[in-house]
């Protein structure tokens, strides 16, 4: 399985190698070719046009090198295809049309009519053991095609012409069978597998990619030859030159047999079939176009050997007894032999090809090295190169045949194998030796070829035998070299296939040169019977197709070998002049091809320069876009910085405003607290003033009571003095005693009256005082209770008012704070909205400017790109026209030699020019598509940016609406806060009024309390005054008692003792009024004065006791009042 090329599978590289692979594919079986083509189509549907054009170009550019037997091989290869006939035949038509013309003379009518004419080409194209192996080889190539995607690019151009050298044989076959090949040719480029594998990713310009190859400009045969070297590595000039010269492919293959793979050439067991099944298809005949799905089946591999047996039966030899046919299976042990180096597949070491440039033996050697899989027999298409064509025409396809192998093998053995050997030096040395050998054997080969064609019987065995002898004779000089260069291949194994290939290709070589139509026809007609009976049992024989022909001939019967030797000698003798002419033509073509290679290299350099300029322009565009993006980012950064600075300033202003408002609130709070403190101080002063006023009132009342009491005491003192004077005057004399008694009585009566009056007044006053005091006490208690209740109510009301005031203040502060916050937020949002609007406007302006700049840049870039594309396309058109002119010159030279080659060259030039035009248009389309994709991407980017801007506008609009809604909410909130603040102020005023009323009530209560306290003080003073009066009275009584004791006892005896206690008890029990009445009654029968005095004294004593008790009670009462007054003052305080 050939791996793909390393650099993304450059599709244009393997086109000519793919041709050679297609020859191998045709020999292995066309039925297997199509699965690979299908698999390849899946990945390369978009590149069918490139592949089709490449296939047409290659097929038509190399038409002159196709052998006459190619149409027959094509028919055999296309026999067993199911649904792919139309596609395959499409491409074959363009390739094989010249071959039809070439074959018109020998047997034009037999090609379409006979089902086996395709097989007739096989004996002439491929080795003897596989004359009918084209069907089998086509089958085997399909498996190889699945493995090597690069092999099917233009393989179907020679798909039906499997036995031809990649270029020349397809042309010859198209000349020989025009109708059949044209039916088959044009459909082949349409098959998916034959399309060049151009991957869409290669349109992306990579530094290591070949732009010309990617765009399809390298699809020409010259470009393909250059690309053969690219698959193996970077060897542009040397490899291309050697490929154009046709050097070293087979020779290097012989020199390095193990280059493709380091495995022994052993045939796989599944391909080694017993000889008993060789005759399965031997007796079957097929009409042209008949569908036999089993013809190309796995049994078809043995049909090749069977047809070979048949061939040798016609020549008198037993094919089954032939050692070469039995030993050939181990010849190709490696299933993937096409992975050899570029020199091996290019056949630079093949001396036989150089010795006989026009002979099909060269072609056989070259294309026998093409087989890719072990099941691929030596491609018969290699041997169908007409002798008339220059060897260079057959060599480039031979060189291109190695490209699929190199493509399959590039990843493994590319660098290591080419570094080990200098295959170019070997190719040059072998070229010199081959030139000498060519001159020596020219005459002999010519004579032998003429003899072989003259004695050609119409049967298929006779021309085959003659061609075998011719090839063997021609290969005699190079057999030693080929045997020496193949150390890994057993001579017995490889001899038969090589000999058969040479013999098969000998007849068409001679016939086109000399124009012997009967010989060609006889060689072609009997060959048509072979394809149906071919069942190749040697799938891997083509691995080493360049075995010495002498060994192969030695395996044949002696009579056959002698006949072939004689034919080869005659041909060698007759052909020196023609070989020399062909050598001159090949040299001229070599010079032309070298010039074309140089032109193509220059063209590639120009395209690389164009790519560099495009890349520079693209880089400039990218830099411009980046600069615009950077400028936009800078503008955005500046706008955002300005916005941030603006927001910072607003934040600072708002914070300063908030601090000032906080300070104002603190000042207001301090003022309110100061006012409250002043009010409390005024209330305290008023309370103290009321207390002082009450105290003054009480003092005044007490002073009045004291004054009254003192006046009474003064009167009592006067009375006492008078009594004392009376008592002292009574002791003077008795006469005066009566007077004194009378006076005493008067005095006692007056005293009694006075005492009764005093007592009555005292009782009344005391009672009144007691009642007044009780009433006052009750009033005082009630007032105290009421005052305490009012104080408690005032305290509660004050606490409630204070709480309400505190709550209202807190609520007012909170509402004011919230209001300020809302105002700040509203102002911040408004400023933010304004700043965002300004920034949005700036962004809009900036984006509009940037979009305008970008549009202008895009227009300029588009115009510049279109101008460059136009200039490049004009240059490409000029180069293509120049190449077309060179192709015209080359066709003119070919027309001088052969009319058929001239027509084919003209057709190839026409197809090439058409292909170039289509390639130019496709390249333009590709570039336009790329630019359109870039423009679409830019448009998408602009659309995305526009959508982003629209989205930002939407967001800003929504933000603005949200800000407006927030502003409305804030306004409503502000109104609510204002209304609440009004309500709070009203409530605060109500609280102030209630506080003032409470303070007034408190002041009134304080005034009342002070008045009560003053009254209490006044009463206390009065009590003290009365107490003093009582004390004075008690002293007076004591004095009276002393005075009574001082009286004479006679006065004391007057009073009955029994009546004393009674009187005392009566005085104690009776009120003072009856005592006074009793005292006022004078005693009967006794002296009234001493009794009266005694009674008066008892009465006074009793009154003194009563006064003492009264004073004690008053004192107790005053003490209780003092305690109560202190409590009241403490409560009021």
Curated annotation (Swiss-Prot):
Composition skew (Acidic residues), residue ranges: 277-286
Tissues with expression: Present in various epithelial cells (at protein level).
Region (Disordered): 89-198, 211-544, 1062-1085
Composition bias type Low complexity, residue spans: 125-134, 295-310, 473-482
Keyword Cytoplasm annotated: yes
Disulfide bonds: none
This protein's UniProt keywords: Cell junction, Cilium biogenesis/degradation, Coiled coil, Cytoplasm, Cytoskeleton, Isopeptide bond, Phosphoprotein, Ubl conjugation
Cross-link Glycyl lysine isopeptide (Lys-Gly) (interchain with G-Cter in SUMO2): residue positions: 960
Sections of the chain in a coiled coil: 577-727, 773-870
GO cellular component, one term: anchoring junction
Single biological process term from Gene Ontology: apical junction assembly
Main location per the UniProt record: cytoplasm
Compartment(s) where it occurs, according to its Swiss-Prot or TrEMBL record: Cytoplasm, Cytoskeleton, Microtubule organizing center, Centrosome, Centriole; Cytoplasm, Cytoskeleton, Spindle pole; Cell junction
Modified residues (Phosphoserine): 142
Keyword Cell membrane: no
Residue stretches of biased makeup (Polar residues): 165-182, 325-336, 459-469
Ranges of compositional bias, category Basic and acidic residues: 102-113, 221-245, 259-276, 415-424
Annotated Pfam families: FBF1
Subunit structure: May interact with FAS cytoplasmic domain. Interacts with PARD3. Interacts with TRAPPC14.
Physiological role: Keratin-binding protein required for epithelial cell polarization. Involved in apical junction complex (AJC) assembly via its interaction with PARD3. Required for ciliogenesis.
Protein name stated in the entry: Fas-binding factor 1
Gene that encodes the chain: FBF1
